[in-house]
Design a protein with these regions (language model features):
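Rossmann-like dinucleotide-binding cores of NAD(P)H-dependent redox enzymes
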Residues: 18-19, 24-28, 34-107, 166-171
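Short, T/G/N/S-enriched strand-turn elements that build extracellular solenoid repeat scaffolds
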Residues: 1-3
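FAD-site-proximal beta/loop scaffold in flavoenzymes
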Residues: 5-23, 110-171
């Protein structure tokens, strides 16, 4: 989200959320992939009012529709407000809350929460990973590997978030 800086309290990344000092009473989680869904589940379990927002047409967008539907139904039964096919716009952060518009089609709803968690746009950090003399092939910033997790350089293997989705280093 452009011009939105994570401060670790009102606006959080998933890493910052793991270190939060105070549990928010309410939170909007932007991105309903594995990271967003996990945070939605456990924050809700601890009593935070959770709104989970996904731009695509179902939560857990890299999973099959059937699995996502079962998880979404469970989330709704547990009290998580799931919004799919929804964009987050006009985010305004102040000392006590975050206000934003949730846009779905031609309908806009303004909501306010204590915090917003950004669970989108994980980027691999390969800078300084190896000597510049090692010609490691990257694909959109991620280390390219074969079926055995070997990189383009014989004997160098990679696994985890550095090879791309699904990004699960937060667990």
């Amino acid at each position: 989200l452009p011009d939105l800086e994570a401060d670790g309290e009102r606006v959080m990344t998933s890493r910052q959320a793991l270190e939060m000092k105070k549990q928010p009473k309410s939170i909007v989680i932007v991105g309903a992939g594995a990271i967003g869904a996990e945070f939605a589940y456990f924050l809700n379990a601890f009593g935070t009012k959770v709104t989970l927002v996904e731009m695509l047409d179902h939560i857990l967008p890299v999973e099959d529709h059937e699995t996502a539907a079962v998880v979404e139904k469970s989330f709704i039964q547990e009290g998580i407000d799931c919004r799919v096919s929804t964009a987050v716009e006009n985010i305004k952060v102040n000392a006590k809350s975050v206000k934003m518009d949730l846009v779905k089609g031609d309908k806009t709803e303004s909501i306010t929460a204590d915090s917003i968690l950004l669970a989108i746009g994980v980027v691999a950090n390969t800078e300084g990973l190896l000597s510049p003399r090692v010609n490691l092939k990257l694909d959109r910033g991620y280390v390219k590997v074969d079926d055995n997790y070997e990189s383009s350089v014989k004997g160098i293997f990679a696994a985890g978030d550095i090879i791309g989705p699904p990004w699960l280093a937060h667990v």
